Design a protein with these regions (language model features):
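Short, conserved charged micro-motifs
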Residues: 77-83, 142
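Hydrophobic lipid-interacting interfaces of membrane-associated proteins
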Residues: 134-141
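Short, acidic/charged, Gly/Pro-enriched secondary-structure junctions
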Residues: 81-108
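Solvent-exposed edge beta-strands and adjacent loop segments
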Residues: 2-74, 105-106, 113-126, 130
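Short, loop-centered acidic/histidine patches that primarily coordinate divalent metals
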Residues: 73-75, 100, 112, 136
Length: 145
């Protein structure tokens, strides 16, 4: 039987950050987020499962695509800096996303680009400026061993 008194831990929302390796002027820390902070979502499979006559053969991929979304406080200049970057060059490069968990390591994404801009509310009831990126996340490192 498991211990019912296992410590649950705590999240720290001000840990969340987006660090842009080659464009540090775009780095985002807690004070620059709007109401929401950030999300990361895998797209597609980390491994293919290829049918055979009598079963299936796994075929691990060396990378997985991810969507990275975060919401900036649009009343701060950093939101305009991200908009300027989108207008100038949609290629961002590598980014590091620090999570809200003190025990979960950061996620490092390669070759990130802008996906799109979600709806921006302009009626004075939301301060969120949405940023959507797509990047490559290395998985299955054992393939290279």
């Amino acid at each position: 039987m498991t211990n019912p008194l296992t410590p649950i831990g705590a999240l720290n929302r001000i840990l969340t950050a987006v660090q842009v390796v080659n464009l540090p002027q775009l780095n985002v820390t807690a004070g620059f987020f709007g109401v929401r902070a950030a999300t990361i979502s895998p797209e597609g499979e980390a491994s293919d499962y290829i049918p055979t006559m009598t079963g299936a053969a796994p075929s691990p991929r060396p990378y997985q695509m991810y969507s990275i979304r975060f919401w900036l406080n649009k009343s701060q200049a950093l939101a305009q800096a991200w908009e300027n970057q989108r207008q100038q060059n949609t290629t961002i490069g590598d980014i590091n996303v620090v999570t809200d968990s003190p025990v979960l390591g950061p996620y490092y994404f390669i070759n990130c680009t802008f996906l799109n801009v979600e709806e921006i509310n302009l009626d004075g009831t939301s301060n969120d400026y949405p940023v959507m990126l797509r990047g490559t996340y290395p998985v299955n490192a054992a393939l290279f061993a």
